[in-house]
């Protein structure tokens, strides 16, 4: 988180400071990219949700949350294209924070299930234009589907950086508060949609 904030800092002194953070990140990124590549994660994620819905959670609602790269898969689950063997949806709603790996606006336009997004103002993975596209698409979708019981939300956390919702600096009061607000956003979202469902989903 500290390195992510450092990379977005301005000023000539911070440019020098960035070099150390880039070198630090470079030692971990190749390993992370290898372990989190789509070919390795996709075969685990979607079958997991199918199996969960067909077994332990057969009569329970499932919500899913994704942060950074995990948001890509939550978004796809909210397209409602992944089904159980008997054709049931595998999740009821999704929450994402500081998403990465998405294609804008296409991936957002495909969303059909209730979807909540917590965005960071300073995020290399979601530019200001992409954030605006996301907000506009979700707002338009809600206007069309609200009467049918499907809504979406987009919350911009001003001043925050990528990763704030899971790796907030507790020593920085504002950042810590914003991280807790994003957590509350997720919890409230799931409570809201689970409350609207019957026990035998």
Regions found by a protein language model. Give the residues of each.
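N-terminal cap/leader regions of alpha/beta-hydrolase-fold enzymes
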Residues: 1-201
